[in-house]
């Protein structure tokens, strides 16, 4: 931000006279300054003082100097100023909108202490601080004030955030407090925010932080939640004073702080999120700054000083000029002022989110603003100052903007159309469309206000080329979709968005009504269409007619004018609307009827008075009449009855007008008497209902007001006596009977005997009613009444009287009914027949006269035929067996299917004449197959063939003809027919006939005869494709002969003979055509060749002009030269391309050379300026003398080349001496050198090099050595010879290099000698450094050929101990390596040992490795899977090593699924108490208890092994640090479980211990947290079942089935635990991952449980003992006492306890004695083993081994 001083608004005084406060108005038009004299000065935006007024004290008695103004702020509408004073009051002055308006106080707010600061952030809300520490709010609307929050400290400063919805107050104790009216979703906290080190007199709230400063000369920036962001410390600056005031820019991106003679400016850097100080503005003698005010648009900053001065500064980051028409002033990163340089108008463009404005463009005829930020898009209308900011992600600048609509900007990007309404910060809508053309999109945004509609925003656009979508942009939903049959090329909604006009590519204009979803085509050949602005009138052009729809609701009513031009536009203004028509070169205006236009607008706007006024100016026409009717309807709906009355008067509807006039008088009278709307009066409402013929509504309105008389009067006036009497009956009116009599008398007086009869009938007087009916001439009604009453039927005279009347009146059917009723069937039948009541006659005849039925059916059919009801007659004729009549009726009724059905039932003779008639019908419907079948049935096959022939269906006709005619006859017929067609010029039909009879050649001949070559070619291509090219060529030649060259061209080209075409045009002298064909059809150079020939035919200047025109002059010269036309080439180059002449000479020379004319060629080469080419020519021909002659005369530089060429010849002849001499003459010793090298004459090469090119001698020597190396053995010998030569010459270094170059190429002995010789020479004669290099080079090479000892000795000569050791190691000479390490450098002994170990490991020599590194050996055994050897070897090591590898082997076995082997491992080697092994022990235990087939006597040894291992582990744990740990306790539980399993297996081997085994299975259930719960319950249930404990078996097995279901479902949540309440069987157990019991055994259990549950004999209760608890539960539920488990059964020991030495171990005496007795009787070794284990586990057995007491 840069500050530039503009002007001084108020000059400073000599002494202290501080400006107390300043403020800018919200509209940027006014600036207020309050001076020390308490006077407010008002300035305009340009800095001119325009007004002033004095403030007043709270009480005049204290005088005008009794207070100071501490705060001042403009209202949001800029028409008021609030003044905060130290005499405890705030005044609000209304200053008005114009300068000079009277200043009046409109509000005042008295406070309890001095006002210290003040802000006016929102309408009606003033916020201010008091000296007592409170921050309060004054409401200008209610004239009341209230406290927002209070502190105990003086309020020194007050500021708001950028939006004005939050306030920040600074207090004398340094506290800064924040309060929000609306946090705008930021979620920031309220209340005390921070405690500043000093009173924050300078306080500003920017967008991203809070800036505070004061007397400590430090500026601190705080974050949104009060944490310190930055500190700017000026306390050490002797020039700086305290900071007195601060202000934030309107965008919140900059802050200015005032101190003494200085303004400090800070700018927020968004990318780094820090404040950065700009260069301070220092002004000498400005003194202390007391007030700052920033203009709302950010462009000006005003500064008030201690001496009363006010300075104005211009603020901006940068300025730019846009297209020399607009000035762009960036007053902040997020705020730009756009100024029109011509008009001076300004618009402030600002990002409300604080984003940096990156680029501003002015588009759309320089009216619309477009600007981008990183996250948003800014849009604006410069004319209306409406601005929008919407979220917008950058899309690479690919957006397209359309500004055709003044209310909305259309943005098109990546197939998506976005609409933004100017002035709205949300997108109006977004749709997908690929058609971004303003003519294919129509947006209407509140363009005409309508009655009852506040917001109307609609969009019409194309979804695809034939589908229009209409969207309500407010609701965001689709309100219509128009699918059209052809492409839409223009569309537009009317201004109200109710009608859509669109035109398709066929120039048809359609109108779509959105509410009714109806589409109407209103105009054809429409070239122009437009809605008249401000109305729903439509103007369109149809050819020479101008069409105008004044009332679009009646699209069939159109006004048309004849015009003689094209409509180019519409102009509306000055009270008239004109259609502009371009007639020739003049523009003619056709004026439309403004009244008709205005009428529609007035109607839509609901202004019916205006509409009436319009219509009264018009003459009555059909259009005007329609408008009056529309207005009358709308006026009635809106209850504007006077207007409706006027409408009906205009329409000539006098009755309605009079009725409305009376209604209006009633309404007016009510309005005068009672006030309000008279139309709400009940009589008015009832009369309006009567006007709409809604008499029931009128009745209801009357009766609601209890106006019964009025309701009855209404009906009487309308002569609606029935409704009148009904009202009287409903309300119990006393005049009811009188009404009825009056009604009857009125009926008789008006001769309404029928209605009177109905009245008498309803009252039950049948005779009177009949008499009246007969009098009225209604015998049918009399008959109906008689038929319903038996007593009247008995009156014979009456009945005869009625029947006579009926017959007289020819009401035969009714008479028949009466005769039938009185049982006179004969007369009834006659009457029915006369009255054509055949249905009743047939029904009666079936009962009374069956013989007559057939005749009646035929008569019925005849009657129906007379009535033209032929369809109905068919069935009656069928019933009457009149087939011919039925067929004719069916044919007459066009019931063809019925006719066919009836015909199929007739004999062939009868039917044959009718089939062709039906066939003709089907032929007319083009249902030829059915027609053919019918013709065939009617023996009219020829007609069928004719039918097919006339229909052009020759194939079917041919097929049919072949059936009934001989093939040759068919061919003759068709060919004859085809010839007739040919004569008539119907060639296509003739062709089809020829082709049908397989004679396409006749058709081809026909077309050729008539020169219809296209059709001829078509047929040839179809029937003789192999002859197509020949045909084209033949036709081409024919046409060429006839001079029809264009047609001939076509055929030549189709025959792929473009050259023939070119030749044809050349022969005819049509070079241009020939050139065209060659260019388009030939290859890349064909046209050039033709152009060349064309030019050659012209010759001279004409040829040059032509070739220049075609741009082919150079190409032609080249072509002529290339084709040996040198005369033409020289002619062209001479005339136009002189620079090409040497090139032509050159080509001519080359031509002559090829021809062998060397002397002429030499002359041409020299003319071409290419003597070197002549030299080369002679060299090529080995004419050395001529070559040298030309070179010396014309190209001295080539002399050397001639000599070189001659030398090359000498070399080829092996004349090396001559060649060398020539090369040296040519000063080319290098070439001589190369030739000797190529010839392998290295000695000569070295000689030449030494004499003439000594600088290359060394390189040549190296090359020679490389060459020798390549040659292998021969090369090696050369190296050795060379090395000896160098050695003899004392060149030891070179000799060494030669020796080193010797490679092992099959002769390793020689290589070794050479290398050793090199080493020997280097050690003897070369310096140490070189010596070292040689040895280090020779050593690896000796090792490479297996001479490790020799290499090691070399290394040892130079004390390279490690390299020597490495050589011995690589040679696997370990003893030598160890000896060298031991004797020369003991540090390498470990190095040798390590490599020896690695060697043994790599070689797999584990047995040898054991003696060196046993751990490595063991690891190698593990790697090789030799576990037995590994364990065997480890056994010989210490206990720790052994168990490391035992654990590894056990882990391997467990992974392989061999847990039993792992267990055996620990049985053999013991189970140490290593925590690392715990998981192994647990896994072995888990696998054992989960394994199948272990519930048997045979499994004893497995369980015993597990038991013994766990016992060993527990004994070891007691001695370890893990004693009594949770792991120890868990293993003790596992030991107990293993003991139970082992004891159970032992008991299962002895019959008498079955119950012991069962009890152990039951006892194991209390440990199901460690066991597979389903397996445990299954085993317990089966054991209980085996010993006859059915109750327990049922409960356990039922639980087992529940568990299997739970495993399938994957959850235990559904289990019922009620059976196991008050037991120690756990509920919370792990859910097994799989079933542990096979499917068959599960099904067996399921069947048993189902059987038992069906018997209902068992009680589902577990057995209980003397404790009242479950007998196997250790814990008594009632007492909580826990009993010890018996070592033999696991059951609780309640009495007869035998205790063992180890505490906690006991047995039940009975069980113990039983177990001992079983051992004694069975001598079971496994039981004895159990006893042995118990003795070991429990510290010995009880003293008495057997106890039977």
Swiss-Prot record:
Result when mutating residue 493 to R: In BBS20; uncertain significance
Site of covalent link Glycyl lysine isopeptide (Lys-Gly) (interchain with G-Cter in SUMO1): 4
Keywords: Acetylation, Bardet-Biedl syndrome, Cell projection, Ciliopathy, Cilium, Developmental protein, Disease variant, Isopeptide bond, Methylation, Obesity, Repeat, Retinitis pigmentosa, TPR repeat, Ubl conjugation, WD repeat
Modified residues (N-acetylmethionine): 1
Keyword Translocase: no
SMART domains linked: WD40 (SM00320)
GO cellular component: axoneme; ciliary basal body; ciliary tip; cilium; extracellular vesicle; intraciliary transport particle B; sperm cytoplasmic droplet; sperm midpiece
GO biological processes: bone development; brain development; cilium assembly; cytoplasmic microtubule organization; dorsal/ventral pattern formation; embryonic camera-type eye morphogenesis; epidermis development; heart looping
Disease note: Short-rib thoracic dysplasia 10 with or without polydactyly: A form of short-rib thoracic dysplasia, a group of autosomal recessive ciliopathies that are characterized by a constricted thoracic cage, short ribs, shortened tubular bones, and a 'trident' appearance of the acetabular roof. Polydactyly is variably present. Non-skeletal involvement can include cleft lip/palate as well as anomalies of major organs such as the brain, eye, heart, kidneys, liver, pancreas, intestines, and genitalia.
Subunit record text: Interacts with IFT88. Interacts with IFT57. Interacts with RABL2/RABL2A; binds preferentially to GDP-bound RABL2.
Protein name, entry field: Intraflagellar transport protein 172 homolog
Organism (species): Homo sapiens
